[in-house]
């Protein structure tokens, strides 16, 4: 660093959207102190790596990122979920400057200060009111809580991030309002268990504008829906009170989209996972949700090859999917995670069987997705534009979250802008995407 110049930070953010929000908070604090962001590791005074430690494959990706930072720079600070159990990092890279777990923002800042002290300029404000975002300007993740009270056997998130800690409703709403004022058109509500929001606070009220708002899933969703942006709900568990939120979707207050991680359908597997096993009742609820809100899109994730999963269990899952008709689906092959209680379960499934089941499930889902998307041909859909080209733009409908769902490719005779919301006539559908033309031309 040259004498008098601002110190530069290079940042690597790995893992889920919750970790991305953690990265945004750290960067916002550092920018407020005058730090600049470097495009490359070798041009930075220090590198921060926000790790993921959920799966062994994610740990390997984190270790690889740390190794690259050490090779290209040498001054590396490690934080995030993998940092909660630092032994593996310390063994592989004993020269890292600091290792901390998730949400330990102050410890990260202290490590940065030790490695490269800030230059204070009281006349310069480097941070906009909405903070520093790592997403495109037109959408942002809004984290409403940390941690989780569930104890699924395959998951170590409670060990890494602790039990549920919800933010006061007014705090969430103030952040959301700042984001919308800064140009954000879509708020993606995230947590480990969004529908449990406020349980730890006993649904306490907090002051928002001229009224009090309870820290309750329904109340928060209703208030967010008044801010003038798309509101998309992720990581929702199918608790009974979710039915009330579907009512808000039917009224057009929040997007008709639910991201619910069902993980499986077989009662035997769900019991081994320690997840709600009444998936037959869930099918009835899905039908009632769609009756109340016909445009509802459902996204979910599933695990195949969980210990003890039999051919009959897997066949049950495929039949369940045919009836549920999940719109968007992600599937993972089970892999052991250090510290997870599922590691000790009997009847581990061979890797080749996991792969066969993954292939079969994704093939089945491809047909379901194509069938559901075909029904949208001839309709008009609102599309938020993510990328623009000379004649065709890439965007998403209300049924598509960024990065994980499908896309809508639209033609237009006029230039479109990133973040613009247009109405398009859908003319064609394939397995995962839609194609159309901006209406009015």
Curated annotation (Swiss-Prot):
Radical SAM core domain ranges (all copies): 134-371
Chief localisation class: cytoplasm
Cofactor(s) named in the record: [4Fe-4S] cluster
Organism domain of life: Bacteria
UniProt binding sites for [4Fe-4S] cluster 1: 16, 52, 81
Purpose: Catalyzes the methylthiolation of an aspartic acid residue of ribosomal protein uS12.
Note on how the cofactor is bound: Binds 2 [4Fe-4S] clusters. One cluster is coordinated with 3 cysteines and an exchangeable S-adenosyl-L-methionine.
Family: Belongs to the methylthiotransferase family. RimO subfamily.
Annotated InterPro entries: Elp3/MiaA/NifB-like_rSAM, Methylthiotransferase, Methylthiotransferase_CS, Methylthiotransferase_N, Methylthiotransferase_N_sf, NA-bd_OB-fold, Ribosomal_uS12_MeSTrfase_RimO, rSAM
Catalysed reaction, written as an equation: L-aspartate(89)-[ribosomal protein uS12]-hydrogen + (sulfur carrier)-SH + AH2 + 2 S-adenosyl-L-methionine = 3-methylsulfanyl-L-aspartate(89)-[ribosomal protein uS12]-hydrogen + (sulfur carrier)-H + 5'-deoxyadenosine + L-methionine + A + S-adenosyl-L-homocysteine + 2 H(+)
SUPFAM superfamilies reported in the protein's UniProt record: Radical SAM enzymes (SSF102114)
EC number(s) given by UniProt: 2.8.4.4
GO cellular component: cytosol
Top EC category: transferase
GO BP terms, alphabetized: tRNA modification
Keywords carried by this UniProt record: 4Fe-4S, Cytoplasm, Iron, Iron-sulfur, Metal-binding, S-adenosyl-L-methionine, Transferase
NCBIfam families: 30S ribosomal protein S12 methylthiotransferase RimO, MiaB/RimO family radical SAM methylthiotransferase
Cell compartments where the protein resides: Cytoplasm
Molecular function in Gene Ontology: 4 iron, 4 sulfur cluster binding; aspartic acid methylthiotransferase activity; metal ion binding; protein methylthiotransferase activity
SMART domains for this protein: Elp3 (SM00729)
The protein's name: Ribosomal protein uS12 methylthiotransferase RimO
Location of the MTTase N-terminal domain: 7-117
Listed Pfam families: Radical_SAM, TRAM_2, UPF0004
Species this chain originates from: Bradyrhizobium sp. (strain BTAi1 / ATCC BAA-1182)
């Amino acid at each position: 660093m040259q004498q008098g110049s601002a110190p530069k930070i290079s940042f690597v953010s790995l893992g889920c959207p919750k970790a991305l929000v953690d990265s945004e908070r750290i960067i916002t604090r550092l920018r407020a102190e005058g730090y600049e962001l470097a495009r490359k590791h070798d041009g930075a005074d220090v590198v921060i790596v926000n790790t993921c430690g959920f799966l062994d494959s994610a740990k390997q990706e984190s270790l690889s990122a740390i190794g690259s930072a050490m090779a290209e720079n040498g001054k590396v600070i490690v934080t995030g979920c993998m940092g909660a159990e630092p032994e593996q990092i310390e063994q592989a890279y004993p020269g890292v400057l600091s290792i901390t777990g998730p949400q330990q923002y102050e410890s990260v800042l202290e490590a940065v200060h030790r490695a490269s002290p800030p230059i204070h300029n009281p006349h310069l404000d480097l941070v906009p009111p909405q903070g520093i975002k790592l997403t495109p300007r037109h959408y942002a993740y809004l984290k409403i809580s940390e941690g989780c009270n569930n104890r699924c056997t395959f998951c170590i998130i409670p060990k890494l991030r602790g039990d549920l800690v919800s933010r006061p409703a007014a705090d969430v709403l103030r952040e959301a309002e700042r984001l919308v004022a800064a140009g954000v058109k879509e708020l993606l509500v995230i947590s480990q268990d969004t529908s449990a929001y406020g349980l730890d606070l006993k649904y306490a009220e907090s002051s928002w504008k001229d009224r009090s708002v309870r820290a309750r899933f329904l109340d928060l969703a209703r208030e967010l829906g008044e801010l003038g942006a798309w509101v998309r709900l992720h990581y929702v568990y199918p608790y009974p009170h979710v039915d009330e939120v579907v009512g808000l979707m039917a009224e057009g207050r929040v997007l008709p989209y639910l991201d619910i991680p069902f993980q499986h359908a077989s009662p035997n597997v769900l019991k081994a996972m320690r997840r709600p096993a009444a998936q037959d009742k869930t099918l009835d609820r899905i039908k009632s949700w769609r009756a109340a809100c016909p445009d509802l899109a459902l996204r979910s994730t599933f695990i195949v090859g969980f210990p003890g999963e039999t051919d009959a269990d897997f066949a049950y899952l495929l039949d369940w999917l045919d009836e549920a008709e999940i719109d968007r689906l992600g599937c993972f092959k089970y892999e052991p995670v250090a510290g997870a209680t599922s590691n000790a379960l009997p009847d581990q499934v061979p890797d080749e069987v996991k792969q066969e089941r993954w292939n079969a499930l994704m093939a089945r889902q491809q047909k379901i997705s194509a069938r559901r998307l075909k029904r949208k041909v001839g309709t008009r859909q609102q599309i938020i534009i993510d990328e623009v080209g000379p004649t065709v733009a890439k965007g998403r409908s209300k049924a598509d979250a960024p990065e994980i769902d499908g896309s809508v490719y639209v033609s237009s005779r006029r230039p479109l802008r990133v973040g613009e919301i247009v109405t398009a006539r859908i003319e064609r559908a394939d397995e995962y995407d839609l194609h159309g033309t901006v209406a009015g031309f």
